[in-house]
Each structure stands twice: as C-alpha cells, then as structure tokens.
C-alpha cells in the first residue's frame, strides 16, 4: 500500500475533472476562488489546527480574520461586482461560516436592510457601512418571537421629536443578533411604532448602540452575549439587547414609504400592513438563496471527506488476510449511503446558480422601479421556490454530514474529520432565514392559491406550468430515467395539489377556520406538496442545464449524476406514488429501486474524480480524512503524535488515589 | 402568562404519571435512581453549568467524579447486585456518558474481558480491578482495523518464556481505547499470537502498561491521546498505543481454552479459529444491550426537552395579537415531529428491560456451564436480536435529537438546550460495539440461515416462530392497530426473507462467490429484513408487556403509546409493503397514514404527563429549555444575564481599526 489507492480510482474516471468543474462553476469563478484561497494561505491568521477553541479564542480569531478581509478590500457589493462577490463568499462559507457570518450580517443583512428601507437621510450611514467604519447587526428576533415576526413586542414611541425604545417584557428582549454581543456600533431593529397613542405596527429602524471609541453601550441599552453555542457559531457573537427608555433621533425610522411629520403625524404610502411588512422583510428572502448554497456546501464536504476516506479505508475482503481487504468504497451499501449526496452537491449547485440568475434579473427589474403584474408574479414564484428549496437543500445537507460521519466509522468521529463540527455548523441553516417547516407553508400556500387557475397558470420562471396538464399514470419506463422521474413528479405534485386542496375544502365546509385548516392539512399533504414541487424544479433545471452544456466531454458523467440524484429523490416518495395511484403492483417499486441501485453502481468509477471536481482546496477542507492525497492514516497519525505521553496534572491525584485503594484493601 | 402553561397540560392527562413510571420501570428502580441523584446533588463536584469545557478541564472533572463514585462504593458487579447496578448505570448514563464510560470501560469491558477469558492466574488482577487499585482499558481497535477485528495486526511473539509485543505498521497502532491516554495502568489487548514461527491467530492478553506510581509507560510502549473529540467524548481519554519489543510475562495470555506450555508449545481446546474468536469477543455482545439503552435515553432527552419547550413556546394563533398565540405543541405538525420519539422512549425501555431479562437467564445458564443445542440457539437468537436492536435504537435516538433541536427553533441551538451536545454524545453509539450496518448483516445472516427450516423454526425467545406460517395479505383493518401492524410486519419480514434468500441463490447460481453475494443483497433487502424482524419483536414484546400489566389505570395510555410507536415504525416500510404485495391500491396507505395522524393526535393530552413519567430529574436533565417547571424563558434569561456587557480584549483593537477606517475615508 505504498502509492495511495486514490490514484487508482482517479484513473477510472471517464472524464477530466477540471473540465467538469469549469463547466459547472464557470472558469472565471474557479480562477477567482483559487486567488482568494492563495491569499488566505499566505496569511498566518487563516491557518488553523484541529483543536477546539474556547468561546473567547474563537471570537478573537474571527475578529482578526475579518480585519484581514476588510483590509484586502475584496468584499465588494454583490451587484457591482457579482463574480468577485460569489468567489469570495463561497470560499469564506467553505472556510468557516462563522467568519462569513461576521461579514454578511454587516454588509448583506444590516447594510441591505438600511439600503432597502431607508432614504436619502441614511446615505451617510450606508457610506460608513460600505467603508467598514461602523459595525452593523440585525435585530429582528426576540426571546419570545422568531417565526411570527409580526408580533414582536419591542416598542418605539414618538415623543417630543424623538423615538423612545422600550422592551416591555422579558419575551420582548432582542436576541440572536449576530455581531451584537461585542462588536456592533449600529443595529437595524424592528419595533412596533407608536405615534400619538396609536400602534402603527411593525417598522424597521436603524440606531447607534455603542460609542465607537469606548464601545460602551448608549444610555437605555443593555447588551449581552447568549453564552456558548455549537460549532462555528461559538465564534459568532449573537447578542441580546434590552431597551429602557432609550432615546434616538427621528431619523432612526427607516422611512421609505412611511414617515412621521415634524409635527408628529404618522403618514404612509403603503396600502396595507402586510404590504409594509413585506417591504420591511423583503431583504430576508435574498438570504434564502444563500442558505440553499449552505446545503450544497454541506453535501460537498460530506461526500468529499467520506468518499476519499472510503478509498483509503480497507476492511474485509473475499478471502482472509489483511492484504486482501478491499476499500470500503467497493461495498454497494457504502456507495448507496454516500453517492446520492455527491450527486446532490453537484445538482444543487447547478440549480442554485440558475436560480441566482433568475433572481438577479428579478432584482434588477425591482431596482429599475418596474411595477407590473408579471413582476409581482415573479416575486411570488421566487418566494415559493426559495421557500421550498431552502428546506430541501438544508435538510439534505445536514443529513449528508450525519451519514458521512457514520460512513467513516470510528475515525469519522475524530475532531480532525471535521464531520461533527460541520454538522453543528450547518444545523441552524434549517432554522434561520425561515424555519424550514414554516416556509414550506409559504410554498404550499402559493401553490394552493393556484389550484383554481389550473389550465392557465403562467409564471415567469415557468416552474408551475406543468400543473396545467392533467398528468397520466405510469405506463412504462423509457430509456431516460430523468424523464421518467420528472413524469412521476408531475403526477405526484398535481395530485398532492388536488388532494390537499380538496382536504382544505372539506375541512372548511365542516366549519373549521382558515387557521385550523392550514394546520390540519400539513402532514403528508401540504408539506409533501411543497417538497415535490421544489424537487421537480431542481431536477428539471439541471436537465435543462445538461441540454445546453457546451463541453460534450463531461455530459455523460453529468447525466449519470443527475440520474442518481433524481432517482434518489423520487424513491423517497415511493409510498406516496402508490397512494396517489401513479402506479400499482410491486413491480413498479421494485424497478425503481433497481434503477436506483444501478445508478449508484454506475457512479463508482467516476466517484473520486467527481469529488475532485467539487472538493474545496485542502487548506479550506481542513480534514485529516478527506485530504486530496488520500493519505488519511498519515494525517491521523501526524495529529495523534502531537499528544504523545501527555500527563495532565490530575494524574498525580489518580496515582495517590490508587495507592490509597491498594493500601485500604490490605488492611 | 403568570402560571406556566405546563400545569394546564399536566391536568389534561388521563393517568397518574408516577404510577406509569412505576409500572414501566419498577418501583425499586425508581427509588434507587432517586437515591443516586440525591447523592450526586449533594456533591459539588457533580454540579455543572452550560459552559463548554476544554479537553483538559473536561477530563479533570470526569476524573474527580469518577473518584467520588468509587469512594461511594456504589458501583457493584452487575450479577451480584443487579438492581443497584442498573439504577446507578442509568443515572450516570443520563448524567454524562463520558463519566459512565470511565467506569464501564474499566469494570464492564476490561474487567469482564479478563474474567471471561482469563483463568485462576488472573484472579489477583480481577480482585484489584474490582477494588479499583488499577485502571483498565480495552484495546481491540487499531488505526487500520475496527470492524474486521480478525485482521488486527499487533503481534505477540513467544520468546524465551515471555511474550514480546510489536506494532508492525502504522495501521497496527492500537487506538480508540477509552481510559488509555492518561489513566490506564493495565489493558486487555488483542494481538496475533506467534509461537515457534507460527501465527496461532487472534488472542486476548492482559498487560500492565504504566507504573501505577509515576504513570510512566513501561519500556517498549508509547501511548498518546487522540486529540479533540465531539460532545462528552472530549472528556474520555481515548488513547493510541504503539509497541516496540515490549516484553510481558507469559501470564499475560488470557488462557481460557488455550495456553503455551512451559516448553513453548501452543495448545488449545478450541475446535476452530472462529470458536476461539467468538469466545474472545463474547464480552462485546453484552455491551450491545447497554447501547440499546443509549438509544432509549436519547429519545427520552429529545422528547422531554422539545415537548416541554413546545408548551412554553407560543407562536401564531387563530387571530392577530401576541395574547392569542398558541403553544407550538398545538400544531399537528409539531406533534407529528415529536410524539413518535416520546413513544419510542417508552417502548424501547420496555423492550430493552425484557431483553435484559432474557439475556440474564442466558448468561446464568452459560455461567452454570450448560452446553446444549438449545443454549447455542439461544446465543444465536440473542446475537441476532441485539445486532438488530442496537442499530434500530441508536438510529432512532440520534434522529430524535436532531428533530428535537429543530422543533425548538433557534433557542434549541443554544448550548443550554443541550440538544446538539446530546446529539454529539450519542452519535458514536451508531458505530461502537459494532458499526450499525455491519451488525445488521449478522442479523440477516442468521435469519437467512433459517430460510431452509421454515415450518420448524424454534428458538428460546420465540422471536422467529411467526416465520413458520405463510402470512396472508392485508384484508381489512381491525379495531386494534397494533395487531394490524404486527400482521403487516409478519408479512413483510417473511417476504423479505424469501426474496432476499432467492436473490442470494440467483447471484450464487450466476457464479458470484459468497462474499460478493452478501454484499449485493444488502440494499433494500437484507438491511430491511433485519430491521423488520427487529421492529416486529420490539412491538410484539411491548404488546405482551401490556397484556400482563397489573396496574390497569395506566394501560389505556400505554396502549396509545404503543399504537403510535407501531404505526410510526410501520409507515416507514409503506413502500416496501406495496412492493412485497401486502396491499395494493392507494387506500391502504392513505388509511395507514390517517391512523398514524390519529395516533399522534390522541397523545396530545397525555404528552406532558408522559414526559414527566420518563424525564430524568432536572439536575440530570440539565436543560434550560426542558426543565420541569416549564419556565424556559426565565432559565434562558438567567443564563443570558451572566454575559451582560462583556468586553473581550480584542474590542480595543476593533475600536482602533474602525477609527483608522474612518480617518482613511476622510483623506
Ligand atoms: C445561529 C443563529 C443565528 C441567528 N441570527 C439571527 C440574527 O442575526 N438576527 C435575528 O434577528 N435573528 C437571528 N436568528 C433567529 C432566527 O431567525 C429564528 O430562530 C428563526 O427565525 C426561527 O424562529 P424561532 O426560533 O422563533 O422558531 P419557532 O417559531 O419558535 O419554532 C419552534 C417550532 O415551532 C414550530 N412552529 C411555529 N409555528 C408553527 C406553525 N404555525 N405551524 C406549525 N409549526 C409551527 C416550528 O416549526 C418549530 O418546530 C438566528 C438564529 C440562529 C439559530
Ligand atoms: C467514541 C468511541 C469510543 C471507542 N472506544 C473503543 C474502545 O474503548 N476500545 C476499542 O478497542 N475500540 C473502541 N472504539 C472503536 C470502535 O469499536 C470502532 O470504531 C467500531 O468498531 C467501528 O469500526 P471501524 O471504525 O473500523 O469502522 P469501519 O469498518 O472502518 O467502517 C467504515 C465504513 O465502512 C463500512 N463497511 C465496512 N465493512 C463493510 C462491509 N463488509 N460491507 C459494507 N460496508 C462495510 C461501514 O459500514 C462504515 O460505513 C471506539 C470508537 C468510538 C467512536
């Protein structure tokens, strides 16, 4: 076993991984990313080992790294320099989500909120934000309210030309705001605006919270940290904040579409509270696209680490003798457990990139001031799809890391595998920017709203058009599994829409109110509807990408990847396919599963090269089990040797204790 | 919201939770556990907060706690004082698996191995082990071998009346041995025994590795730590060990059934290498029953924390206004996500307790020296069931903690919820004492071995008897969901056995060797077979327990619990039920899912009282979200307030940096 086995596996592939990478990610993106990586490698502050840092240490390194990135001046505005922005973002997200959260929350959450809700009077602040002269945080969540943002309880009361902020109860204390506990000088904060004794509802404000020199909090503001957190979020200073008659100037009100006149009258151009709220929170939906990428990245890490390790790891063989043991990657079961996430890493990337393209077009039209029915349809569709894709991608991502850990056996549990930490890092992606089950309701609500217009559904991204045709049941398999899968998804989505909608009617007719109805149709119906619609779109978009791909040399392997991805997803709906009547008889399911097993097996010779095409640089990957040289044992032992012959101070106490026990027993 | 809502939910229950607890756990067990808890509460060394300790700190507290427990003299031998042993074990496991590992690895793994493989010449060592004059570790795993223990490469060579230990390669370095890195004075170590130039195969040895006074390693031995690990295992000093001509006396050989004569001849009474190996590793299967309990405990923690929090957490409501918001436990979807694990916590406990009963009977017969065909059938059946139940229970356990975290929204991600840490704590239970997918193969191998004797299968625990009758397809639902579920499982298991066995034949006939055949029948077939067999037994045993229960007042609620557990498990096989032909047509699946939703809903009024009946004492639970007083927000804020106005030292640097940015922009 002198030359690592991984080289043998590299040679099995039918394609050139660099070409595949270029085809999927774009050459420029690949080049820009490697520039960022080179920059990071050359800076000692980005170097790291496998020790677990304390809360204090972790935050200090995040601070140092953040400073470096700001100094580099690389972190550009997404709209002025899209390519650089994506390259930097992706690299940082892969390197450490804590560090990237530090930058994002300031620029893309705090900054974007001020920009989108503010007016000319906030220009100076926006300037300072872009120039990193201040540090921003985003304070929406309260101890008692996260998902139900409309009911947050912090108050901002107009008084004598100023705004007075208060926290009326424990559950109104702001919390979870990243950057807040130690660094923020300014925050965007949401509160109920009271003017002349009337609650004008949910509004966004921007206020200063600390003196930028002493970092003391301003009068009437108490800020604290939330204590320990898992994974990389230990390095993020999520804070809580309590107001007691904190006075801020009137300019704190982010006054696009509403204002308070100098003589203290509230005026607004919003037609309804919900219109105002949707503008106030509009910036949040942008974030969802970024979170889809977190899911993709999780699948990327999981499959890279576990598949490379599965080549180095040999266990059992056809005949006795350690020399006859085979790499665990050879076991069909091991492949079945890992390859679907490899295919997901690639397909979600392709899907997400296309989605970002659509979204950018949408945003451009919004920024240009377009007001049209089509644009509002566009907004709805973006909302439906992002609210479906964020849960699907993040659930897959977290699941993939759990499975990868198990597939690496005991060594997967070492800190240096990084798999448990990565799982903890990604865990909250299922919750923030919209709790997954909550936003799936948004997708199904929009779809259910279309149930009446079947036959004439038209949307800008055409993700719902297939619902116009009554789909037919399964008749036979074609030679193209992806087409077969898409047909099944169309039937599934259509039928789930029909049955969920019918169930809602039935419940309404039985006297339930719309709140009860919505709650009662979720399980097995609305939830599955949202997921089926989303997965259909994902698969369909990747299929389109494949049709348009220029480099024909990588098309066959991508086809294999998509075959697996689509069969893997569909198999999870097999029971529902039977229930909705798409097929009957055992053979359909048996066939589907056989096709799935086949699709898994077909990826085996390509697996290591596919991993090479998605894996981040070793420096970013930072996993003893997943390094590209395939020398897992060497890396493991290198780390082990650092802890040779350790004698913690309590061993003395142990020696005395054993001594005492032994004397005791002789009495 | 002055009186916590939890009290209202407590009153909804139809039963007395204390009676339920006594019925399920036994009064004596409940009493003994509360004695242990009281003892722990009174000792400051067992107090803890929510900070994450460093590797060094965590190990030091484990050492201190271990000392206290040894001083109490509570940790008795399982066979001489079963009740006390179980009460202590369960309490410690719930308190911190790291601390309990410290005790277990010494007494129940190291000690048990010496006892079972050793002879009279090891009596003194056993005495010292029981008296805690030495510290033991168990060294089986090597860097290159875990699952395939037969191929471990460490050698023990007979030379001049002594045994010489060597580590021939990097992959032969012992690793993962708990207690080894700092504390162990002695270890049981497995190696290939070479006598007169011949490899006599895999043997167990017990050797001293450190001086008990200086704790220096003995000549020819290098020991180190494995660095950082996740969760409570950070507190466990899993170590690695390398031999270079380490000489030990001949008495190191654990010589039950084999020996080396004074003149250097190897003698053995074992008939085959596999017989020897199964005796050498026999002690391991005992452990599996303990690991099933880890899965149960994980479900217990997950459902306790998430269900109690779901009552305190109110979000959304039928009409606007924070005062109209309802506890998230009211949402059918939230119930659907959590109640199955509550039912699993209770049912797995009942199953595991019964299994321990059977196992104890089995061990008694072994210890009495019985040698019979029936006993060897017993051994096989215990092996099949424990190899199935350990995966089923630990997968459910880890899954439950992940779902519970998500169900607690953002606050679930705080360290003080304990959910992520508990997930990390439980994660390796899926891997150690037999990697889950590996041992499922043992279950299916045993079942497949029975395929030929259908009609006359008889085993001591009768878990396979149902296979003797050809089961019939679904005809209609009865009034008892558990009976319906069991019928479905019988059909499922029977058919999976038939089809898996047929597939194996087909592959063999096509020229594949038995290694290939075994690998190729796993996915969708052998794996599902093992799981179905195990789940059938679990449900069946709980049903039997219910039939025999004395306290009739708790029977109805336990019936609800079992209804849910069995429907929940079966629903996961719905697609396979269709494939195997148990049912056809959408209605069957729709009905099954409706029954499942109903079973979930029926548990709602009982949920909090059920949680009370399984929840460990608050001191042990140690979760701000899950405390029995239902005051989650108060506990969260109490912790938050500890971190008020923190100013880490780097904030100075940040202030200067912002200052510089601002000056720069003005130039
Ligand atoms: C690491 C991290 C960073 C964060 N950063 C920020 C930040 O910078 N700024 C900020 O303002 N916030 C931040 N948050 C907060 C985050 O946005 C919220 O936690 C998130 O929106 C989820 O809301 P919640 O916690 O209220 O969940 P909850 O709504 O309390 O969810 C709890 C459970 O109830 C269920 N549930 C709730 N309502 C319903 C319903 N109607 N039907 C069915 N089920 C329901 C949910 O599905 C979930 O299972 C952060 C959170 C985390 C974990
Ligand atoms: C926290 C912890 C504590 C431990 N404590 C101890 C201890 O005290 N003493 C000790 O000796 N050991 C200990 N161990 C080691 C543990 O026993 C092994 O890790 C465990 O047996 C799994 O073996 P492995 O790591 O070799 O997994 P591997 O066998 O390497 O498994 C890797 C992957 O390969 C797959 N695979 C392997 N063979 C096959 C096959 N034939 N077919 C299909 N798939 C296959 C597995 O399913 C898995 O997905 C500990 C481990 C941990 C994590």
From Swiss-Prot, chains A, B:
Its main location: other. Its EC number is 1.3.3.-. This is Acyl-coenzyme A oxidase acox-3. CDD domains: AXO (cd01150). The active site is at residue 433. Belongs to the acyl-CoA oxidase family. In contrast to other acyl-coenzyme A oxidases which bind to and are activated by ATP, does not bind ATP. It comes from Caenorhabditis elegans. It catalyses: IC-asc-C7-CoA + O2 = IC-asc-DeltaC7-CoA + H2O2; IC-asc-C9-CoA + O2 = IC-asc-DeltaC9-CoA + H2O2; asc-C13-CoA + O2 = asc-DeltaC13-CoA + H2O2. GO terms for molecular function: FAD binding; fatty acid binding; flavin adenine dinucleotide binding; pristanoyl-CoA oxidase activity. The keyword Calcium does not apply.
């Amino acid at each position: 076993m002198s030359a690592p086995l991984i080289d043998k596996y590299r040679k099995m592939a039918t394609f050139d991984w660099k070409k595949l990478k270029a085809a999927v990610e774009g050459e420029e993106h690949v080049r820009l990313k490697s520039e960022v990586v080179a920059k990071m490698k050359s800076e000692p502050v980005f170097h790291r080992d496998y020790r677990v840092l304390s809360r204090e240490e972790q935050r200090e390194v995040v601070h140092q790294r953040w400073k470096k990135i700001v100094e580099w001046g690389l972190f550009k505005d997404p709209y002025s320099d899209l390519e650089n922005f994506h390259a930097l973002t992706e690299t940082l997200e892969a390197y450490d989500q804590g560090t990237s959260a530090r930058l994002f929350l300031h620029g893309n959450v705090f900054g974007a909120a001020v920009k989108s809700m503010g007016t000319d009077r906030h220009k100076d602040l926006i300037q300072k934000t872009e120039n990193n002269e201040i540090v921003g945080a985003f304070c929406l969540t309260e101890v008692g309210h996260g998902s139900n943002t409309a009911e947050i309880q912090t108050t901002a009361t107009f008084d004598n030309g100023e705004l007075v902020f208060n926290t009326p109860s424990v559950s109104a204390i702001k919390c979870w705001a990243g950057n807040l506990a130690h660094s923020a000088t300014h925050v965007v904060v949401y509160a109920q605006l009271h003017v002349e004794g009337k609650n004008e509802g949910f509004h966004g404000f921007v206020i200063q919270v600390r003196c930028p020199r002493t970092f003391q909090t301003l009068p009437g503001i108490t800020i604290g940290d939330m204590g320990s957190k898992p994974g990389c979020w230990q390095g993020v200073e999520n804070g809580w904040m309590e107001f007691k008659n904190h006075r801020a100037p009137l300019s704190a009100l982010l006054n696009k579409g509403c204002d308070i006149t100098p003589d203290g009258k509230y005026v607004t151009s919003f037609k309804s509270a919900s219109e105002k709220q949707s503008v106030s929170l509009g910036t949040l939906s942008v974030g969802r696209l970024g979170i889809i990428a977190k899911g993709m990245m999780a699948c990327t890490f999981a499959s890279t680490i576990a598949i490379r390790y599965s080549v180095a790891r040999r266990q059992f063989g056809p005949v006795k003798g350690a020399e006859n043991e085979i790499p665990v990657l050879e076991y069909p079961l091991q492949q079945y457990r890992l390859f679907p996430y490899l295919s997901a890493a690639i397909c979600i990337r392709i899907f997400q990139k296309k989605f970002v393209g659509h979204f950018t077009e949408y945003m451009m039209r919004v920024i240009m001031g377009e007001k049209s029915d089509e644009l509002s349809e566009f907004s709805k569709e973006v909302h439906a799809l992002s609210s479906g894709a964020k849960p699907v991608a993040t659930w897959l991502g977290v699941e993939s890391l759990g499975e990868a850990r198990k597939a690496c056996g005991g060594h997967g549990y070492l800190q240096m595998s990084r798999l448990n930490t990565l799982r903890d890092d990604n865990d909250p992606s299922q919750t923030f920017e919209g709790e997954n089950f909550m936003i799936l309701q948004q997708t199904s609500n929009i779809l259910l709203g279309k149930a009446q217009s079947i036959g004439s559904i038209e949307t800008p991204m055409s993700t719902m058009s297939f619902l116009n045709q009554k789909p037919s049941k399964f008749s036979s398999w074609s030679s193209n599994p992806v087409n077969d899968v898409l047909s099944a998804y169309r039937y599934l989505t259509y039928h789930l829409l029909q049955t969920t909608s019918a169930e809602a009617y039935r419940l309404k007719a039985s006297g339930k109110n719309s709140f009860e109805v919505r709650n009662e149709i979720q399980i097995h119906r609305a939830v599955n509807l949202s997921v089926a619609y989303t997965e259909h779109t994902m698969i369909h978009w990747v299929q389109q990408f494949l049709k348009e791909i220029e480099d024909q040399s990588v098309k066959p392997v991508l086809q294999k990847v998509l075959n697996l991805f689509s069969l893997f997803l569909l198999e999870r709906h097999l029971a529902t396919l039977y229930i909705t009547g798409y097929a009957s008889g055992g053979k359909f399911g048996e066939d589907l599963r056989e096709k799935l097993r086949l699709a898994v097996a077909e990826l085996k010779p390509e697996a290591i090269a596919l991993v090479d095409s998605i894996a981040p640089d070793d420096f970013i990957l930072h996993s003893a089990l997943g390094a590209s040289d395939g020398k897992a044992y060497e890396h493991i032992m290198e780390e082990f040797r650092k802890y040779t012959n350790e004698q913690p101070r309590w061993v003395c106490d142990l020696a005395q204790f054993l001594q005492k026990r032994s004397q005791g027993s002789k009495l």
